[in-house]
Amino acid sequence: SHFEIERHGITALIGPNGAGKTTFFNLMTGFDTPNTGTWQFDGKDMAHVQPEKVARMGMVRTFQLTKVMSRLTVLDNMLLGAPVQPGEGMFRALFPGMWRKQEQANIEKAEALLERFLLIKKKDDYAGALSGGQRKLLEMARALMPDPKLVMLDEPMAGVNPALKQSLLDHIMALREEGTTVLFVEHDINMVRHIADWVTVMAEGKIVAEGQPKSVMNDPAVIDAYLGAHANVDLGDDSVLEDL
């Protein structure tokens, strides 16, 4: 009934399919409307706040199925995430001097992030031509355009090859080093145990356990909820996790 995210750390949200993890993300970011309950971000009430305003307030998210604009270039996809777009209005668009400097700053920031995520050579390609893993990188890079305080990643490792998975892991840990708070959903318990500072476990729409990774992985309620038929195994044993 109560969920908090520690600042400047990596919190993992885990649980079996259907536990409510993505629904929780949707509620927190304004994509769905809850029937009851309250929630705050950075001391501000977030009830009835629209998704685009949530992002401007510093809470951004990615999706299980990447949301890239296939018919826009990679660079244009990045620019969609820029928080300041003074040339969008009809009147201002007629006067380039009012927005050209900011637009150039947005482009420079986007290119710097594409360089960081090893996508700079793709900046002029259509986003639809990217591989699934590259789209994951693009979505994470775009999420950083508004300098968020909290980044919410919904299964960032799903469907990517081992090399890209390691790249994504490095980027997530780099965010923590930079002081950005990270909340991510993941099914790879072994990976969660190695990079998360705090773990929250959901099952059937409820929080069943939370704490540091080692203690959570040994919680009988977690083992029962998350592994079912494998409830007798030790989640702290790497060899067992590899077999699963």
Regions found by a protein language model. Name each.
Residues 90-122, 152, 170-173:
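Conserved ABC ATPase "signature" region
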